[in-house]
Amino acid sequence: SFDHNTEPSSRKVDYLEIVTPDFIHVPATEKDAEAVAWMTAHVNSTLAELGFTVSTGRVVDFRFREMLHNDYFDGAVPMVNASHLRGGIVRHPIGTKKPEWFHSDPESMVKFVVPGGSYVLIKRFSAKEEKRRIVSAVWCSEGSVAFDNKLNYIHKDGHGLDPEIAAGLAVFLNSTRVDEYFRVFSGHTQVNATDLRMMRFPRLEQLRALAKHVVAEQQDIDSVVEQVLASEEACE
């Protein structure tokens, strides 16, 4: 807000910086404009163009309490929720109060679980202590798994991704570049599947290059993303 004594400010922005084929950006500051410009220059594929799909986890905990269990037993599959994503890694089980296993009749199992494989998980709601809006990690398993409704997951036709591609996607999504870009066009803390469908992602060869440098520290993640996506070789 401004008082009557505040000098108003204005910015001239090129039309193409605001209106794109996918949505309208509002780069209110120079930092916003730079975030959009960088992403536009170095990233140009949608998930659909890469052959991938993003969906929301199928299990709504309060609706399926009878299918959720605190302890493992024969036939149960992992029930993965947002609390299992920590530091770019999915840790399961971790001994939380929330049920960590899912089991039901065969018909429901087919409906609510996904086959084993590598999936990129993204929290739909970021926690207060998390600095980034988008928090991502890779889940990898041989057996089936159930994902909580508070998670989005990237897959290929309902099955897992190439593990290398999944790792590259997680590195990209956890970068500061993506966080700054996401904040330009999304004013809320929720990350919807629709938002992810509209975003731009690196090409497959770039994702494989990112996967060779899987790191945990934010500074290292950002350095790798800059190195791979902004390099002349990656942009050829």
Name every feature range the model reports, one short phrase each.
Residues 1-45:
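Signature of N6-adenine DNA methyltransferases within the class I
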Residues 3, 235-236:
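A short, terminal or domain-edge coil/loop segment
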Residues 31-234:
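Polybasic, glycine- and aromatic-enriched phosphate-binding surface used to engage nucleic acids
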